[in-house]
Structures are given as structure tokens and as C-alpha cells.
Amino acid sequence: MTTPADLTLSQAASLTSGSDAWHLQGVEGTDIQAHMITDGPHGLRAMIDDGNMDLSHSHPATCFPPAVGLSSTWNEDLTREVGAAIGEEAIDQSVAVILGPGLNIKRHPYGGRNF
């Protein structure tokens, strides 16, 4: 298994940016692989074209209830089922990381989630 100590400075620095908006780059010659990431706090939003940021240009996916809705049911089994279903969709789309749900993030009326 590759550790940070095994990387050159250049290789380690390359891990601080992605290969594009939706992919973390790997390091050639190591076991650090490239990974696809997606956005979507209510499920998966895998983009069809890596360079396209148009929200309508994504693979079809299920829109699950938001975390606040699921938590208000107090139904732990249902919440686990939703998590498993999101995981199955991620595996189907070869997605390694889902950026969401938003949990304890700073919100402000002037800046939403500050981006």
C-alpha cells in the first residue's frame, strides 16, 4: 500500500487537485487510483461529460428525500435503506465519492453555503 512517504514531492502535490471537475487523479506507478466524484446531497449526480458543469447534463438518478426529511421520520431502517440504495447507484455509475449530504454546514442568508 502506498503511503505519503512513498511519493515524490511532485506526486504528493498532484493529489491536491483533480484531473477535472469530477475526478480525483491517481498517481501513476502506485496503487493510488483515479476516482470519480459526484455532487448531490439527495443522491447521485454523475455528469455525462467530464468537462460539462451544466446540471441538466447528468446521468438519470433517483432523487432521495433530503437528510432533514429522513431524520424527521426517526426511522433508522429506512435511512439505512436509502443509504444502501445511494451506494448501489454509486457502484453502478463507478462513483467513489458522493459530495453530500450537507451536515452541519454554515449557512448564511447572503451566501447560502458560502460558495
Language model features with spans:
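N-terminal beta-rich core of secreted/periplasmic extracellular enzymes
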Residues: 1-115
